[in-house]
């Protein structure tokens, strides 16, 4: 088995329980990201589109720290707390991946780690 390498971008809030990303061989696994600032405070309250933009920015920071780009994302899994937020999420997803979108799954859940969070996204990346 390949060695696991944690990916820890500058500026992202840290959680001692998990790494923002873990590289194993040519794959990078990005932990579920929520819309929080660098101090762990929620952003984009009641605005799924704004939250998704912040999440994609966080994912991009992790991906770029590993030496890849958003074009290298091959799969995302999204968790929404309300299906009515799907259009806002979908708009940002389409803007983030305009040419060759990754495989994508969306799951509606009862809630996320904090009630302010409307969306969470995790990703798998094939490193160049």
Would you name each region that the model predicts?
Residues 1-57, 61-74, 80-128:
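N-terminal presequence-like segments and the immediate start of the first folded domain
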